[in-house]
Regions:
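Active-site beta->alpha loop and helix N-cap motifs at the rims of alpha/beta catalytic domains
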Residues: 3-5, 9-14, 19-22, 27-106
Length: 109
């Protein structure tokens, strides 16, 4: 069984990691905004340093070219990042290219 925690709360992530039952983390911009982080990239990198498993981070762009560019940047932040891409025609097109590049992608609505 895999257990993914849907949060951006660092303390919750630390506690879950300490218990050893969390497989990974899913985040989104609204969850991160609640945590009032000063720097989005640094904040995500901190989460990635706590959890060994996948950390899903959402790309906000809507057209394929912009999604690809944003996803490449996000994926460069840490080796355990999975980029969340919208399940739209543009997102699927971007996913095809990103997969060929070895970037881990999670399609979501």
């Amino acid at each position: 069984m895999y257990l993914f925690l849907d949060t951006a709360n660092i303390e919750h992530i630390r506690r879950a990691a300490k218990l050893g039952v969390v497989s990974g983390i899913t985040t989104n911009p609204s969850l991160v905004a609640k945590e009032k982080c000063a720097n989005y990239r640094d904040f995500i990198q901190e989460i990635c340093s706590i959890i060994d498993g996948p950390v899903s981070v959402e790309a906000l762009s809507q057209d394929a070219a912009a999604i690809i560019e944003e996803a490449r940047d996000i994926a460069s932040w840490a080796s355990n990042i999975v980029v969340k891409v919208p399940i739209t025609d543009q997102g699927i097109e971007a996913t095809s290219q990103l997969s060929r590049e070895g970037i881990k992608v999670n399609l979501n609505s």
